[in-house]
Regions:
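Bacterial C-terminal helix-turn-helix
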Residues: 1-2, 9-73
Length: 73
């Protein structure tokens, strides 16, 4: 299964489980839930090399450092 299909199915299941009361600001909720483990996994993959992790993630090292602090990684 590709990542796009996984996300689509997961969001559909989440909305189904919520029934008639879907959460406000679903986009922000999903981004918060996904971004922290994404960054942690890429940092682990790079052995903690923030420059390489930032390159893989397509962000600046400064942005990566801010996110690491935000999520206490």
């Amino acid at each position: 299964m590709c990542l796009r299909e996984f996300v689509s199915e997961s969001v559909a299941q989440y909305l189904h489980d919520m029934g008639n009361t879907p959460p406000d600001d679903l986009h922000q909720r999903i981004m918060t839930e996904v971004e922290a483990p994404l960054i942690a996994t890429v940092l682990e993959h790079t052995g903690g090399n923030q420059s390489r992790a930032a390159e893989i993630l397509g962000m600046t090292r400064s942005t990566l450092r801010n996110r690491v602090r935000r999520y206490a990684l």
